[in-house]
Amino acid sequence: MAQFFKPQKKSTQPQRIEFTVDSLDHHCVGIGRHQGKAIFIEGALPGELVKARILEDKKQYAHAALQQVVTPAANRIAPFCSHYRECGGCSAQHLAEADQRAAKEAGLVSLFERLGNIQPPALEPVLGGESRAYRRVCRLAIKFDKNGRCTRVGFRRRQSNDLVEIGGCPVLAEPLSVLITPLRECLNRLKSQRELGHVELIQAEQGILMLLRHTGRPTEADRAQLIEFAKTQGIDLYLQAADEQIEPLHQQFAPSYSLDGLSLAFAPGDFIQVNAPVNQRMVEQALSWLEAGKDDKVLDLFCGIGNFTLPLARQAREVVGVEGELAMVARAEENARRNGINNARFYKADLGGDIAGMSWAREGFDLVLLDPARPGAFEVMEHVVKLSPRRVVYVSCNPVTLARDSQVLVKGGYRLVRLGMLDMFPHTGHLESMALFERK
């Protein structure tokens, strides 16, 4: 019988290195160099000598995990959360809030200079709010522990898919944070623990709602357990099946939030901004920068449920909102009706494709506002230039795509006149920003 040679796999030990951190990027991630290669490392500060383990090694750069701070920086502070070292939710609690903002602002300017080839003006004052108990929305991971035969609830471990079990979270609104422990106890009483996905907690103006992902069909006994939990905690509870259908299990109210004197209804699964006070200030600033008048027609791209559209409609002659999800368009129309606004129209459209042939896109607009998701709005930027609005406000949750998309406007005859950071997510690497462009 023929014998075939099968080489044995070599076991490689993770590379461990020591280097000095030089700077922070816009995520508040440390950057240093080792043997000429850029090393990105979470949890480290400029000036610190650190020991680290290589996680991902590329030709031009590498990502490393912090193992030891040999020489701490003078501005390093103690994290306020006991789970900080493990939890992937926050990544910058070792840095004072003012230093976090400074790093993000410097990163924002650098991205415009490097990626957009644009020299931005002096940054506007940071729009911020409270740095703790600010989140009105959260998604908790759920994992069935086969060894312990129990369900664990928490957030993903830093740089891992593992779960860090938590009993509370200091950046969550307190009514959400205190729900975590009783929620875990409830889920551990269910027969269908292995079929649980994740859970979302949302604080509406009327109370708390919970959306539980369930990949199977919960038994009647499990349904009864969940309903009893919702009644005891005084919350609304919805189930989301594997096919994305959402079923109200215990519903007492129709959720909404207040904004600029308006009431905006939303449903479980809809996107809403997690930081209510900063959202209010963000909308106020966008309206102030756009300066819509009674004769102006405004285009609001990626409009969602009307977060910017409806406040704009009270200033402008007409606003057209465009959104990619039909359910969100319906919600925006409902919100216009409930607030007595009749000068706003809404359309569903794929804003990741060619929009030139769409009826609304052939209309004339005096002003444009964009608030895209992380991939940005590159596909519509050329059309925005063709519309030739006198001002464009771009609200961004990804400064990389903002800098990229800004190039299109600048090449199309616009100049960047205002730029500022929104501190929507303190203690994290997320950076929200707003830019104003004016036609030359």
Swiss-Prot record:
[4Fe-4S] cluster binds at C81, C87, C90, C169. GO terms for molecular function: 4 iron, 4 sulfur cluster binding; iron ion binding; RNA binding; rRNA (uridine-C5-)-methyltransferase activity. The active site is at C397 (nucleophile). GO terms for biological process: rRNA base methylation. CDD domains: AdoMet_MTases (cd02440). Its EC number is 2.1.1.190. Keywords: 4Fe-4S, Iron, Iron-sulfur, Metal-binding, Methyltransferase, rRNA processing, S-adenosyl-L-methionine, Transferase. Residues 10-68 form the TRAM domain. It holds the Pfam family tRNA_U5-meth_tr. It catalyses: uridine(1939) in 23S rRNA + S-adenosyl-L-methionine = 5-methyluridine(1939) in 23S rRNA + S-adenosyl-L-homocysteine + H(+). PROSITE patterns: SAM_MT_RNA_M5U, TRAM, TRMA_1, TRMA_2. This is 23S rRNA (uracil(1939)-C(5))-methyltransferase RlmD. The gene is rlmD.
